Amino acid sequence: MSLFLKMETFVYKNFIVPLQGKNTFDFVSEHYQKGDRVLDFGCGIGSNSKLFNPVDYIGVEVDESRVGSARLKYPESQFKQIPFISSEDDKIPFEDNSFDIVFISLCLHHIDSSTCKLLFREFKRMLNQDGKIIGIEPCILPNKYFSNVFMNVIDAGDYILSIDEYEKMYSSESYNIDHIDIVTTYGYHLWQYSAKPNELDSNSYVGGMTKYRKLIRPLHLTTLYGKWAVLIYLLYLIIVPIIN
């Protein structure tokens, strides 16, 4: 695993996941019942596996090193490396109607809209008739300029969107969205939602980086990100109470 990924994983594991805490547990508990078959897409190092009964759960990830870390830390759960989905011909290696829930936590904002649309089609194929997606993503909020910039500084994802844009992207692949909540944890605004497939036809959607990301992205093209990510986060924790 590269230094960049190690630093990002450190921040995610030691700050973002613990700070979500009970909010994520309560959110998942509203939708998941023991016996539901769950696909955790973009499971990373497996931290969310403990939200589900191990026999119900399988986590998938394209990064082999993260799958290895997840297997070591959570041996009671199942993890699988999957190929990157980049065309209509690429498939996630599971049968149709295999899952009751697709869980997506802090993943989509790393993926461009054209690939998200391909993934949404695959999720629809793999979900059973009453199945749904439940997800958590950082979101841009109106008039929250400092935290909107902060999320883009600390996060490696290029596509932290507004809730409206996330909804448009899902709707373009025939999903109905149920807005659940917005949880704020030390500068991260986390949108909790569910999405269920409908029978409408798909339509076009082309998204991209927000103005915040376009401003911040050059920082991520240097070697400074991994070196300074934790320091920036700690400075934020110090500064926010002062300015508020």
Over which residues does each language-model region extend?
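C-terminal alpha-helical "lid/dimerization" subdomain adjacent to the S-adenosyl-L-methionine
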Residues: 135-173, 177-190
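Short conserved loop adjoining the S-adenosyl-L-methionine
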Residues: 90-96
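Conserved alpha-helix/loop element of class I SAM-dependent methyltransferases that forms part
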Residues: 17-34
